[in-house]
């Protein structure tokens, strides 16, 4: 009867595999005796079964998503909001920065909402990651536009020139260390240039698709073009507008927002110093500022952001909510939002930054000439008051607990 040999893996010759097995089993008397008895095929079959089970397992690291994959992974369907929100309408946004410094709120992960004011808070807190969560899909596109500008610009002057569609007529390096007031004056005396805007849009779109890996639909391109052309048309005079009414006079222009200061009179906008701008530029280049589409009270986005932060071994340092809570209370979805906040990884130092619009009820922290009051609150205190059933109205949210900043 002809003996059939056990087939071996094609990647190794019988002699090679047998030699490996002899070395691996030299301390096993039983297997050594089998090898010496001429029963090598049986030994080969035995070891092919046993050795994989005895081999130490190597931990497989989870696959890190790309920037584009992470956006898609965290986002929900977009929703409607009755304004374009091309710029902030919160003039007093810097008034809490000195208190953030005093409380030593640094690092961790930042979560925010809305357009450019987030960059000032990120520059102040210096987080490892930042997530911008907004119900409007257009906000995500606007932050992709900003991300491309950060990547393309070498310094603040080039960034501001591309943002406002006003090309620099002199060597741009001259403005690398200018004050924000100098940069504002430069833009005031530089006319918009439609060819420059068109060229910038081409570079921005190419950067978003080729470098960031985010595909743009024709509608996306139109939305980004609308953003760029709005800033080019209005320049430093652009301000927040609602779809249902003309801009309120108390809403600040971009010029005012850029020149605003903290309580000590120090300009703290993200374009106030080259060092702050370069920090943001590095974060953007490292894909660490991630725009996400979703509802604060939705079933997925905020919780998914929290899960991702937890997977990084990080906690939330600051959650900037603007005045979104007002709309959540109007829509009877505030409880769902609070339940989402409860799932975020946090510490006793984690803070909420909110914008309080009194609607007839002034806040003790309100400043003369400022329509909106910016407030700080411990995230744990927010959760405690919510669980105690204390938040019945919007005014409860703003007035029951806050950290004095003055």
List PLM regions with ranges.
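Short, positively charged and aromatic/hydrophobic N-terminal segments
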Residues: 16-17
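Mature N-terminal segment immediately following signal peptide/propeptide cleavage
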Residues: 61-102
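Conserved class I S-adenosyl-L-methionine
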Residues: 105-114
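Class I S-adenosyl-L-methionine-dependent methyltransferase module
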Residues: 131-290, 387-388, 392-406
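C-terminal motif of bacterial Sec signal peptides marking the signal peptidase cleavage site
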Residues: 52-53
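Alpha-helical subdomain
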Residues: 235-406
């Amino acid at each position: 009867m002809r003996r059939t040999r056990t087939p071996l893996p094609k990647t190794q010759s019988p002699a090679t595999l047998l030699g490996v097995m002899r070395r691996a089993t030299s301390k096993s008397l039983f297997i050594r005796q089998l090898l010496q008895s001429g029963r090598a095929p049986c030994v080969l079959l035995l070891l092919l079964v046993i050795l994989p089970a005895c081999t130490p397992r190597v931990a497989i690291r989870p696959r890190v998503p790309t920037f584009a994959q992470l956006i898609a992974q965290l986002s929900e369907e977009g929703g409607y909001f009755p304004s374009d929100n091309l710029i902030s309408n919160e003039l007093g946004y810097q008034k809490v920065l000195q208190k953030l410094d005093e409380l030593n709120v640094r690092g961790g992960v930042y979560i925010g909402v809305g357009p450019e004011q987030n960059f000032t808070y990120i520059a102040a807190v210096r987080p490892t990651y930042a997530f911008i969560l907004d119900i409007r899909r257009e906000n995500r596109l606007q932050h992709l536009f900003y991300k491309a500008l950060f990547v393309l610009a070498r310094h603040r002057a080039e960034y501001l020139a591309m943002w406002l569609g006003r090309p620099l007529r002199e060597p741009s390096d001259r403005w690398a260390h200018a004050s924000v007031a100098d940069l504002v004056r430069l833009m005031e005396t530089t006319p918009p240039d439609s060819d420059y805007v068109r060229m910038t849009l081409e570079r921005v779109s190419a950067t978003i698709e080729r470098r960031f890996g985010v595909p743009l639909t024709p509608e996306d391109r139109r939305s980004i073009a609308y953003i760029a052309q709005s800033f080019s048309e209005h320049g430093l005079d652009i301000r927040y507008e609602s779809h249902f009414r003309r801009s309120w006079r108390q809403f600040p222009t971009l010029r005012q927002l850029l020149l605003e200061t903290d309580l000590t009179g120090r300009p703290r906008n993200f374009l106030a110093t080259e060092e702050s701008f370069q920090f943001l530029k590095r974060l953007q280049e490292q894909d660490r500022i991630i725009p996400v589409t979703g509802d604060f009270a939705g079933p997925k986005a905020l919780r998914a952001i929290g899960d991702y932060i937890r997977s990084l071994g990080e906690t939330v340092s600051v959650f900037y909510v603007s005045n979104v809570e007002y709309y959540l209370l109007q829509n009877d979805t505030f409880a769902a939002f609070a339940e989402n906040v409860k799932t975020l990884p946090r510490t006793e130092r984690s803070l909420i930054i909110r914008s309080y619009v009194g609607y007839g009820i002034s806040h003790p922290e309100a400043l003369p000439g400022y329509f909106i009051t910016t407030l700080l609150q411990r995230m744990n205190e927010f959760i405690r008051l919510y669980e105690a059933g204390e938040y019945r109205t919007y005014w409860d949210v703003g007035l029951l607990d806050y950290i004095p900043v003055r």
